[in-house]
């Protein structure tokens, strides 16, 4: 009988659901995190670069970057009780400064993981130790696998529009235009659909393709329900940083088309069709059934 690792976790919903079937998880709420930690007595404290937390208690002014004394109390309890502490920055290099320099969070942990190998040397220099490692996004194959569903032709995108990331937006506009000009359909599951969040509303040219939203607990229906999925990346020049949806789509047996980034070529090679602003067509539109 395999005994699951008991992990006290502060993470956003996507990561929490990814590890929930792997670990015995206690998701720490900001309001009573210390009491939860003591009562649960975990084998591991795992905290990621969190923006909301699975329950929303770590959002806005209460983000972990503003909760240094509380995070320090958690790590001190773990140190006193020989419980290893791990921090994962899942958004390197974009938010390296936010979590490691401004908030000084990473210095509190025994081990630091990063999604970008090019940041490892920076962490080691900053922290003055060698316990820094690469941890990429991963797919939980209990959730993401090729399902026996009738796949819709065309493309799906499940995610957000970020007004501030101009290069990503230009890539999406170009990719979207290529798809539409080919006669194929695009269905967009907008993570912020009807939330009216400033800077998160898709421009007018995308509105005809928006079909609503799916909670992350149901996103596998989209990833397994289409011939092809669209992935978009913010980081263009990193060796290993990519959007989580790429690996979840691949695990679902779905063809992936993405904006061109260094990491997509380094890690996935020909598995993913990468399209740059210089391309005038999409090279592959679906997986062969035998590849799923």
Predicted regions: what they are:
Residues 68-81, 104-105, 178:
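Catalytic-core regions built around general acid/base machinery
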């Amino acid at each position: 009988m395999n005994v699951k690792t008991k992990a006290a976790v502060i993470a956003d919903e996507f990561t929490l659901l990814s590890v929930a079937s792997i670990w015995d998880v206690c998701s720490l709420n900001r309001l009573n995190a210390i009491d939860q930690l003591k009562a649960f007595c975990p084998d591991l404290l795992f905290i990621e670069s969190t923006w909301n937390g699975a329950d929303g208690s770590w959002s806005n002014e209460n983000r972990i970057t503003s909760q240094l004394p509380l995070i320090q109390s958690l790590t001190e309890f773990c140190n006193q009780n020989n419980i290893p502490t791990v921090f994962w920055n899942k958004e390197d290099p974009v938010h390296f400064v936010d979590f490691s320099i401004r908030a000084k969070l990473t210095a509190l942990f025994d081990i630091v993981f990063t999604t970008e190998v090019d940041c490892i040397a920076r962490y080691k220099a900053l922290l003055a130790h060698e316990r820094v490692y690469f941890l990429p996004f991963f797919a939980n194959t209990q959730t993401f696998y090729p399902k026996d569903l009738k796949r819709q032709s065309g493309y799906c995108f499940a995610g957000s529009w970020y007004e501030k990331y101009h290069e990503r937006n230009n890539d999406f506009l170009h990719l979207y235009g290529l798809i539409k000009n080919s006669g194929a359909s695009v269905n967009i599951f907008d993570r912020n659909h009807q939330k009216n969040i400033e800077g998160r509303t898709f421009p007018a040219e995308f509105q005809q393709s928006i079909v609503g939203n799916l909670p992350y607990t149901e996103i596998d229906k989209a990833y397994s329900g289409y011939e092809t999925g669209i992935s978009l990346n913010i980081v263009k020049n990193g060796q290993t940083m990519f959007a989580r949806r790429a690996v979840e789509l691949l695990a679902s047996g779905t063809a992936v088309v993405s904006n061109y980034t260094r990491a997509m070529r380094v890690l996935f090679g020909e598995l993913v069709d990468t399209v740059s602003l210089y391309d005038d067509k999409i090279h592959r539109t679906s997986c062969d059934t035998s590849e799923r």
